[in-house]
């Protein structure tokens, strides 16, 4: 499989065409961004860590029957994935009050929720990826009612699998963002990534943060935090 021309470059990844019409080549970048791109930095090794962690977690999800776009890891920073049409929604699942939910509800971070909350954000950088209701989603033609229901169900199932796996590593899954795509066959599958860039991950006992909040809030060394998550998951030798 060959990497051909660049199709798209985002904040954290580059996507390239391959000679296979139904596959694309993803390269993880060493860039870190926060606050819709207002804060930026280059952090050596971050691309490798996100690729390793995403590869590990996508394989875990595939093992329990959750379909993803992931095909195989190609190098320290690259993956081969199925080509999908991305649904323009970020699906955020929350288990504990933190981040924007804390500000929006005026509640302290760290309070566990009685049951997970699923939120939808419209993917539009110019609008700042706003929180949207199901009615808004229909007005935007971002997804059908049936697709919204499917996204919610998939997010909650993935949440349960990840909660259990991170708990076995002494990590609390506070919240996380997912993206989904539609294959050529019309199936909705998990796409994008699952990494400390897209999850809030706290130590089970100390609540030390091992995620992008380390960068957002200047809490320490980002690569050390991500390395800790990879180590607890089993390390690169298992990925």
Swiss-Prot record:
GO molecular function: ATP binding; phosphoribosylaminoimidazolesuccinocarboxamide synthase activity
Enzyme Commission number(s) of this protein: 6.3.2.6
Keyword field contains Ribonucleoprotein: no
Pathway of action: Purine metabolism; IMP biosynthesis via de novo pathway; 5-amino-1-(5-phospho-D-ribosyl)imidazole-4-carboxamide from 5-amino-1-(5-phospho-D-ribosyl)imidazole-4-carboxylate: step 1/2
Source domain of life: Bacteria
Family to which the UniProt record says this protein belongs: Belongs to the SAICAR synthetase family.
Protein name as catalogued: Phosphoribosylaminoimidazole-succinocarboxamide synthase
Species the sequence originates in: Bacillus cytotoxicus (strain DSM 22905 / CIP 110041 / 391-98 / NVH 391-98)
């Amino acid at each position: 499989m060959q990497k051909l021309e660049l199709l798209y470059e985002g904040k954290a990844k580059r996507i390239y065409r391959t000679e296979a019409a139904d596959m694309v080549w993803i390269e993880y970048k060493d860039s870190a961004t926060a606050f819709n791109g207002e804060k930026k930095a280059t952090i050596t090794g971050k691309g490798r860590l996100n690729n390793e962690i995403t590869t590990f977690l996508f394989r875990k999800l595939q093992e329990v029957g959750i379909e993803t776009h992931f095909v195989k890891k190609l190098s320290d920073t690259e993956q081969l994935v199925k080509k999908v049409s991305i649904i323009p929604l970020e699906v955020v699942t929350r288990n504990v009050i933190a981040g924007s939910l804390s500000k929006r509800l005026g509640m302290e971070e760290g309070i566990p929720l009685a049951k997970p909350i699923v939120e939808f954000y419209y993917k539009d950088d110019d609008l700042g990826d706003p929180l949207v209701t199901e009615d808004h989603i229909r007005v935007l033609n971002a997804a059908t009612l049936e697709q919204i229901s499917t996204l919610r169900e998939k997010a909650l199932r993935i949440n349960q699998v990840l909660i259990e796996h991170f708990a076995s590593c002494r990590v609390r899954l506070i919240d996380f963002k997912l993206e989904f795509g539609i294959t050529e066959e019309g199936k909705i599958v998990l796409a994008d990534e699952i990494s400390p860039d897209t999850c809030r991950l706290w130590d089970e006992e100390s609540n030390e943060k091992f995620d992008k909040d380390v960068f957002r809030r200047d809490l320490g060394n980002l690569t050390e935090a991500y390395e800790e998550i990879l180590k607890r998951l089993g390390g690169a030798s298992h990925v």
